[in-house]
Amino acid sequence: MAGKTVTRADLTEAVYQRVGLSRTESAALVETVLSEICTCLASGETVKLSSFGSFVVRDKGKRVGRNPKTGVEVAIEPRRVMVFKPSNVLKARINGGAAEPDDE
């Protein structure tokens, strides 16, 4: 079920083909958007893209884990993780249906 992996170059080419910017301008646009998303996430902000989904940074507290091979308990330090929550529109599109756009 694995499909093609879309790269920055693929996104740049899609912008070039659909928007009509030069390849250089398309690459700059893609880099700017991705950079802004990264900057927002690094500062702890949620990035919400309507009809696509939300990127959310969550704090995970300190906890005790276990080495599966030895069974020895290991302390896992607190950390920040990023999660993606797809919108209902994206979920429906992936599953072949059409959903009404929402603000997720």
UniProtKB/Swiss-Prot annotation:
Top-level taxonomy: Bacteria, Pseudomonadati, Pseudomonadota, Alphaproteobacteria, Hyphomicrobiales
Pfam families in alphabetical order: Bac_DNA_binding
Keyword DNA-binding: yes
UniProt cross-references to Gene3D superfamilies, sorted A to Z: IHF-like DNA-binding proteins
NCBIfam families per the UniProt record, alphabetical: himA, PRK00285.1
This protein's name: Integration host factor subunit alpha
Disulfide-linked positions: none
GO MF term list: DNA binding; structural constituent of chromatin
Gene Ontology terms: biological process: DNA recombination; positive regulation of metabolic process; regulation of DNA-templated transcription; regulation of translation
Listed SUPFAM superfamilies: IHF-like DNA-binding proteins
Any one of the GO CC terms: cytosol
Subunit comment: Heterodimer of an alpha and a beta chain.
